[in-house]
Amino acid sequence: MPTLRQKQDSRRTLRLILAAALAVRLLLALFTDGYAYDMSCFVAWGDKLAAQGPAAFYSEGYFADYPPGYLPVLGLVGLVRKALHIAYESPWTYFLLALVPSLCDCAAVALIWKIGGRFMGQGRGRTALTLFAVFCPLTLFDTGVWKQIDGAFALPLLLCFWLLEERRCLPAALLYGVALAIKPQALLAGPVLAVCFLAGVADAIRDKEGVGRAVGRVFGGVGLALAPVLAAGLPFFGWKNLIPSLLAKYLDTTSSYPYATINAFNWFAALGGNWQDLSQGPLPFLSWKTLGICNIVIITVLLVILAVRSWRAGRFSPLLLAAFYTVGIFTFSHCMHERYLVLGVLLVLLSAARWNDIRLYGAGFGLSLTGFLNLATVYSLVGSDDEWLFSAASREVTILVGFAETAAFLLLAFTAWAICCQGGISPLQKSAGEGARPPLSRPCTSAPSQPAWTRRERLALLVLTAATAAISFACLGSMTAPQNPLDAIGTVQTVTVTPWEDSAELWVYPGISDGGSLRIYDEAGNLLYQKELNYSTPFSWTKTTFQAGAGQTLTAVVENAQVFELALRNSDGALIAVTGGDALFDEPDAVPDTISQLNSMYFDEIYHGRTGYEMLHRMTVYETTHPPLGKDFIMLGIAIFGMTGFGWRFSGTLFGALLVPLMWCFVRRLTRKPWAGALAGALLAVDFMRFSQSRIATIDIYATFFILLGAYCMVWYCQSVLVNGVNGSLLPMALGGVAFGLGCASKWTGIYAGGGLAVLYLGVLYARWRQNKPGFQKEFRMAALGGVLFYIVVPFLIYFASYLPYWWRDPSFGLSDWWNCQTYMYWYHSSLEATHPFESRWYTWLLDLRPVWYYLNSGLPAGTKASIAGFYNPVLCLAGLICILLLFWRQVSCRGARTGAGVLILYAAQLLPWMMVTRCTFLYHYFPSSMFALAAIVLVLAQGKDEVRAKRIGLVLLAAALVFFVWFYPALSGLAVPDAWADSTQILSSYGFY
């Protein structure tokens, strides 16, 4: 029995947990938009009910597919909005809509806590399970972001089946009726309720007493279950039409979507049934409807078998049966919606608390993640061209998540069978785990020291870095390009030129222009050629057919633009000598033989590369939607090597090569194992995104480098604090702040990293306090001072200093101008509505489903192709996701180490903000997160008990990744290859980069 002190601590802990659960849901509700279709319905229904009353609500022709049970709550929201003059688009409207479901979610959390305390004891297992329920991705998203009412619908059913667990049948039936009055979806749980009441009759027959009372309970339960439905419908339909109107409403609602699955990522979706008509089917002789009905019969028969077997064995559990049945129906039945899984997940978590079984917890964990991905996918695509999930990437997500959801259900089903029929329990409470490091909440002992660097290891690091650099710099770009432009920005310049031979082609190499043009006239004043010069044309060669006779004087007119070079070629492709031409024809040696990515900009190089040139030459910069530090580095490369393909890409490629030794050092420090660091560095060397993203003159490589550098310094700081204290850890603290500032000044994604760094910074301070060392107050003051100085003041100064090129161009550039730059950046990214054929949502990044197509060389001979795409090594991407999920599972099941928690925090800090972004996004936005996914791979191997086996697995993984790197190298580098090789890389229908 728990002591009075333990009970008080338990109540205090529960209050904190419930406060966190409510706060996070309501904050999400305030700062996110709800699902547009549901929001418009809920607000309109509430306003109509508040204005016209219940009797006039279900008017003819008015769309309202919900039964009356929850409508009074929406009406109350309408009254509050009207009284307080809250607009429909106001965040407070979303707050009000989410308030009741959030409170119901909290009640569900409290129920899990209560059941866990009874069957799991007061240990960490109950706390872990309850905290997972608090931050369950599915319920958080459903209530806080989507703003649905599933929490209010699920709570009475959760209480219903808990009361049935306690053999309190009649109150349970009443609560079932409450849920049925809210949503017809409660009918899915009806067979479980029936089985539970029949089990009561079976108990009476077996005990040979109270049979009549048990049968009476069945009929009483039916009446109590119908009572809330009738009571809720009475104000809306009146006595006369009550039953016919309710029947019509429930029948219409349940039959309103005749599709195999309505965005529910289940078994039917895995078979390709999303939005497929019920008359169609996976096989010519089998329709979706027939398959669904057969599956319902099978699941129901299995329910009866489980119920009978468990009843005979004395392990009859309504909670477990309800979890099995509701999730089973969602998985294998037709006409399922995406949110129907919410109830099932909560029932699984309650069952895990009731039976203290880690397999049930694992099933709930898997189902919550698949359900979250399901909701997030549908939510993020609403209003887009892919709203019905018909694109290749969306179909692949649907199928993969559908298979994953099915696998999670199978785990649930096998566990339910093991518990009900065999009595096999795998307790969660034992998961405090042998060999696992204690969490931050426990007193921390001094960490082991870092292993010394050997000469052999240094040599290996140097060789790997050199090899990476050699491969990265090979065929990076031409080292020659025209450097002397005809500059007509803000004016018009005219140049005459006379070719010595008949011309067949004209090659043009423009420079900076924002709305200029190039026109060429013959001697008679006829326009022979015209090209608009704008943001998309700088530093990129183009060619066109151009017929001009030998000796004919041509006049070129350049208006409001730079043009670096023109070239005329004859029918054989040879350059034609000319007379005149001035700066337009003065660098024939810099004209390339062919046009390719080696001598021309592609993708966002036309923004960032040109801005580096503008900074160097003190021109007004074009690209101002990101901080300037990354473009400062591009400028340095141009200053050293000239405005050439090699010059504008040099700095990024250098940083990409240096990313490999940085990853080596990061994982080495994290694991304290040299072999792990070497493996991490080698894996990153063959990663696709590191290679392709470092060879394009954009800024993501710089932000990613400094984010990883900041993470390295923070890990160093955390390890040092636990041994040397805060005062002995000022060097990593300071260096970490500098790295953080450099990351923020490169791209605002560096700011995302600050959230993860802050959690680690405060977490290790708490761990230091738990060590009970003397003088902690002084350490705390130093940590507070250092945090402000090195993670606020220093980063701000670095960020501000990155704007020095602006000041060089214009000495009057001041604080107000700097602030205007920041507000413009925020406005640009928050209001951007542009679309792109290769944009992708964050959930597709996890499985590398939609590469960014950067470049296509269209001037190659028939039978060959050349292309450049940005994506990840599929081997590393898949392994990284698996290891991230494994680390996450270890943490939520009390089996994780602090190192795993740190990697997860750093990973989540980069990924979570993108989940809230609704504008156009690309796969390369996952680049910083992928660094920690790769670290997770090696960390999981390093934490294995058999180091020899871990090394072998690592080598196999490296070999597989290397094979993929060689295979896909042409698609990463632009190397021209035969069609067969190029086509072989299209391993998914969503790839399409040739």
Predicted regions: what they are:
Residues 117-124, 152, 158-171, 198-204, ...:
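Membrane-interface transmembrane helices that cradle and orient dolichyl/undecaprenyl
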Residues 216, 241, 246-262, 287, ...:
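Transmembrane helical bundles and short interhelical boundary loops of multi-pass, membrane-embedded
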Residues 86-92, 107, 112-138, 312-318, ...:
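Transmembrane-helix signature of polytopic, membrane-embedded enzymes
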Residues 189-227, 238-239, 343, 713-723, ...:
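Perimembrane helix-loop-helix junctions
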Residues 29, 205, 249-331, 417-420, ...:
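Aromatic/glycine/proline-enriched transmembrane-helix motif characteristic
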Residues 144-152, 337, 648, 652, ...:
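Short acidic/glycine- and proline-prone juxtamembrane loop motifs at membrane-interface regions
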Residues 95-121, 159, 298-309, 650-671, ...:
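Transmembrane-helix motifs of polytopic, lipid-linked glycan transferases
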Residues 26-66, 226-271, 573-612, 796-844, ...:
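Aromatic-rich transmembrane-lumenal/periplasmic boundary elements in polytopic membrane proteins
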